């Protein structure tokens, strides 16, 4: 039963992760078909967390979770995500272009009193109308997805207390593989098809939350317990949480690390397009067919499933057999990505190594501890990867095979570093606060994290435009086409900025380890109770 619950919650979050990055692999198409430059793209992407940060919606979400319970909040979050995604979809459709709504958005929301003075407005004068409307939808979606995040975290604590707490994510790979396919389906580019794909998945996610609602209620009926709700929220709860130095160190580690990962995902495909040369595959080639797309995705699922399952095999022969299958098919997956000559299929390898090692890391933290140490290792790998993208990968621009190999290896290591954080950070939160206010604790961590997830997509976009002034000028003057400009950015400065976040996270991890040892927070202790 508990694994079925994990499956329901994981699949719902899987769908939400897909929509979160649905436009990331088609940033170049958004610039060429909708006129979104890097600043507009980054501003729209950052809007996802705007209401969570500046209207404190995520704090309220934690209060709702504590007072109303997991079941109610899960369904509410699914509905909110679906509404926001639908608005986002309409904003990028052809129906929006030339409509009265487009005219209204063009003429309005160019100045937001207070927010403009503080430099935090989610809109600006000259921002494409479609980007403004999409930003509104993304804000609403962001409220839902972050509410879902803390709800799923709470649900896993309820069902898996003292057991494995890692949640595998393949949503990013699914998005990278299928989003461009839907956008280019039939040889006609229509970016709204990609978003529609995400909307359908969010409808499925809502259904998963509804099924979870009835399963969880059935569990309570069988055990004779009422749904677990926490004590009524009190302002003093926040004081209890905020007074913990360990909590603040974990929260800051979270914002630094995730700010160097999630915003990067939104630009990663375009970064590869700008640093490597991808030759267009002939339309009559086998590698250009949708059959290859589906086949590659199926191979990805087998790789993920085999590597994940190998962690639970007790017989050595079965364990290493599954690992061999996963390794061989991973090589096939990478070869197919190279033959397809598309940046999005190269970056799709991002979570595959993570899927295999996340159970290992989760099991290690559960039985051996060392969560703070694992956070430090993850930060070091993060710095190494971003510096490799910034300075090593561009040197292989004219080396087709060498560049792809460097890209694959770096992306796999980055994915592995990403798995270190969920496996070690989230299980540590219950050690820092009382179980009755854990919903508020998760909400506060997500709120701090959301500050970074709002700021850094916007910063990356602005830094790209500011450090590529000649490119921006040439595009404005018609010297180059939008299609050429979209794949010609120099990403060195943004990548160095992200590497600095990793360095700061490493320093904080070191401090956290010292504080843990001095105050006995138990972060280096096993999660499994003896």
Protein language model regions, located:
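Extracytoplasmic gate region of multi-pass secondary transporters
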Residues: 23-27, 244-310, 328-354, 358, ...
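Central cavity-lining transmembrane alpha-helices of secondary-active solute carriers
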Residues: 46-63, 301, 348-361
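Helix-to-loop junctions at the C-terminal end of transmembrane segments
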Residues: 55-70, 306-315, 357-370
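C-terminal ends and interior cores of transmembrane alpha-helices
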Residues: 79-126, 332-336, 380-400
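Flexible cytoplasmic inter-helical loops of multi-pass small-molecule transporters
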Residues: 104-105, 213-237, 520-528
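Cytoplasmic helix-loop-helix junction between adjacent transmembrane helices
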Residues: 131-174
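Helix-loop-helix hairpin linking two adjacent transmembrane segments in secondary transporters
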Residues: 171-217
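C-terminal transmembrane helical hairpin of 12-TM major facilitator-type secondary transporters
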Residues: 323-337, 342, 348-353, 371-425
């Amino acid at each position: 039963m508990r694994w079925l619950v994990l499956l329901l919650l994981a699949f719902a979050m899987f769908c939400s992760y897909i929509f979160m990055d649905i436009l990331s692999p088609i940033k170049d198409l958004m610039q060429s078909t909708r006129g979104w430059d890097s600043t507009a793209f980054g501003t729209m992407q950052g809007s996802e967390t705007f209401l969570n940060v500046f209207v404190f919606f995520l704090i309220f979400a934690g209060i709702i979770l504590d007072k109303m319970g997991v079941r109610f909040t899960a369904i509410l979050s699914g509905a909110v995500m679906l509404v926001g995604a639908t608005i986002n979809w309409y904003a990028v459709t052809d129906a929006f272009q030339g409509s009265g709504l487009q005219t209204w958005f063009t003429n309005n929301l160019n100045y937001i009193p207070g927010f403009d003075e503080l430099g935090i407005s989610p809109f600006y004068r000259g921002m494409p109308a479609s980007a403004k409307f999409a930003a509104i939808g993304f804000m609403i979606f962001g409220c839902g997805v972050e509410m879902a995040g803390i709800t799923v975290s709470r649900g896993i604590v309820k069902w898996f207390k003292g057991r494995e707490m890692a949640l595998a994510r393949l949503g990013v790979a699914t998005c990278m593989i299928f989003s461009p396919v839907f956008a280019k389906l039939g040889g006609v580019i229509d970016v709204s098809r990609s978003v529609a794909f995400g909307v359908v998945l969010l409808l499925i996610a809502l259904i998963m939350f509804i099924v979870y609602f009835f399963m969880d209620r059935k569990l309570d009926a069988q055990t004779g317990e009422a749904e677990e709700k926490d004590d009524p929220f009190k302002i003093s709860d926040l004081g209890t949480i905020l007074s913990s130095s360990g909590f603040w160190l974990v929260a800051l580690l979270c914002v630094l690390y995730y700010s160097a990962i999630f915003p990067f995902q939104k630009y990663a495909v375009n970064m590869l397009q700008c640093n490597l040369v991808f030759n267009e595959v002939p339309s009559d080639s086998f590698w250009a067919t949708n059959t290859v797309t589906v086949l590659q995705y199926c191979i990805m699922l087998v790789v993920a499933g085999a590597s994940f399952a190998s962690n639970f095999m007790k017989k050595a022969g079965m364990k290493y057999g599954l690992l061999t299958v996963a390794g061989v098919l991973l090589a096939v997956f990478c070869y197919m990505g190279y033959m397809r000559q598309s940046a999005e299929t190269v970056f799709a390898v991002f979570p595959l190594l993570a899927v295999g090692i996340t159970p290992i890391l989760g099991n290690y933290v559960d039985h051996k501890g060392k969560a703070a140490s694992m956070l430090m290792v993850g930060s070091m790998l993060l710095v190494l990867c971003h510096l490799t993208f910034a300075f090593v990968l561009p040197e292989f621009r004219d080396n087709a095979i060498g560049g792809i190999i460097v890209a694959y290896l770096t992306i796999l290591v980055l994915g592995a570093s990403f798995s270190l954080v969920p496996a070690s950070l989230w299980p540590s939160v219950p050690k820092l606060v009382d179980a009755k206010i854990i919903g508020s604790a998760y909400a506060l961590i997500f709120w701090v994290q959301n500050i970074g997830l709002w700021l850094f997509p916007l910063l990356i976009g602005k830094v790209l435009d500011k450090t590529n002034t000649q490119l921006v000028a040439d595009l404005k003057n018609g010297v180059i086409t939008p299609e050429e400009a979209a794949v010609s950015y120099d990403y060195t400065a943004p990548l160095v900025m992200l590497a600095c976040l990793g360095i700061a996270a490493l320093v904080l991890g070191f401090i956290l380890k010292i504080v843990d040892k001095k105050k006995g927070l138990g972060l280096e202790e096993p999660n499994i109770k003896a």
